[in-house]
């Protein structure tokens, strides 16, 4: 690889995209890569996710298309050649259809290799594209991207399988993790608080949307309060904006639990605010139907907080099949038993999950440099890797 052209995501103060470029650049510099950050233009400076859930729909589209315009200027000027790589942080990149249109009509010596990272989309039955009825066009879009890229990066073995049954043909790699910068996250708190000094607090960090299954978390809260003799615990939900949901029934129940003093709401949090809450909590709890690896597990694990997630889809791989921090989906009894234990003592393997994800960008760079054969999943027996512990 002569030069890497990095197509990142618009930074939002309350989202992981704020740190994503910095995490990548730190690794690029450590590896002494020659790279270009392809800039995009923001539609608004208000940092608000007004339309949509993950990123603002108008803002994401505008930023992505402006990036493509800048990339195409570079291509027109002859700055890219066949030894270069364009890497997209998100397979969904508005304007990306312009690339095969151009590349098919120019000299092969100026055709860079192209890799995209898949975050979910229509291959995930619980992704928000299905909530909003976008699956038809998104499926066609994915097939279009699949037809011309040199590689698709999956975050785990289960996602690889979903890509396979969707009929994708491009080379698929399992990077087994999400891009993450452990030291950067830890630098955002004054110090890692000793576990024994932390509040008996359980944090829910996912969006309050149906694919994250907040009803199960609220079931757990009510079951905990109904069982005598258990530790008094603060159950909370953290949100980077005003708490909202794509299902109003959750908000009604949330208000009821809040008024009953059973659920605390922390909203409009910036990253440092959220990290300070996690740094003074004992468990981050997850019950998502749709969550591939999740940055929340790495953040909590970096900040000395226990993590409890369902043994579902990507999480057995993410947790290296740890039975103490994975509960039976969707067993309230098993979740409560394991939560009770994790509230009392730090897990002996705390820190290993975040260490693993801290090296994800290195694994991505290996693939981009043509050294990722061990992560390629194109043989008929590709499922053999599912049982393998990654750390």
Where in this protein do the model-derived segments appear?
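Glycosyltransferase donor-sugar binding loop
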Residues: 232-251, 267
């Amino acid at each position: 690889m002569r030069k890497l052209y990095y197509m990142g995501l618009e930074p939002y103060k309350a989202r992981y995209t704020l740190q994503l470029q910095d995490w990548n650049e730190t690794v690029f510099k450590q590896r002494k890569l020659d790279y270009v950050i392809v800039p995009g233009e923001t539609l608004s400076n208000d940092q608000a996710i007004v339309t949509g859930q993950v990123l603002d729909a108008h803002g994401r589209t505008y930023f992505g298309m402006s990036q493509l315009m800048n990339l195409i200027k570079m291509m027109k000027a002859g700055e890219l050649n066949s030894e270069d790589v364009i890497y997209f942080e998100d397979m969904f990149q508005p304007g990306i259809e312009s690339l095969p249109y151009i590349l098919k009509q120019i000299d092969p010596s100026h055709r860079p290799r192209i890799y995209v990272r898949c975050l979910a989309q229509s291959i995930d039955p619980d992704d928000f594209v299905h909530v909003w009825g976008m699956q038809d066009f998104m499926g066609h879009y994915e097939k279009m991207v699949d037809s011309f890229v040199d590689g698709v990066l999956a975050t785990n073995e289960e996602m690889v399988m979903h890509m396979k049954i969707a009929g994708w043909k491009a080379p698929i790699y399992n990077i087994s993790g999400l891009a993450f910068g452990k030291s950067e996250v830890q630098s955002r708190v004054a110090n890692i608080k000793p576990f024994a000094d932390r509040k008996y607090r359980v944090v829910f960090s996912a969006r309050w949307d149906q694919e994250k299954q907040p009803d199960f978390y609220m079931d757990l809260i009510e079951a905990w309060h109904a069982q005598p003799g258990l530790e008094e615990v603060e159950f909370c939900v953290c949100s980077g904006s005003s708490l909202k949901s794509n299902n109003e029934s959750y908000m009604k129940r949330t208000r009821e639990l809040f008024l009953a003093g059973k659920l605390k709401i922390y909203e409009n949090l910036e990253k440092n605010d959220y990290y300070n809450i996690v740094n003074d909590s004992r468990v981050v709890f997850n019950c998502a139907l749709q969550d591939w690896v999740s940055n929340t597990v790495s953040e909590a694990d970096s900040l000395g907080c226990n993590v409890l997630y369902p043994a579902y889809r990507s999480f057995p791989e993410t947790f290296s099949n740890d039975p103490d921090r994975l509960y039976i989906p969707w067993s309230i009894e098993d979740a409560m038993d394991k939560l009770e234990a994790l509230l009392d003592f730090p897990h002996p393997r705390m820190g290993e999950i975040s260490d693993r994800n801290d090296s994800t960008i290195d694994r991505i760079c290996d693939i981009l440099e043509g050294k990722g054969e061990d992560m390629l999943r194109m043989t008929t027996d590709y499922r053999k890797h599912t049982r393998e512990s990654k750390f």
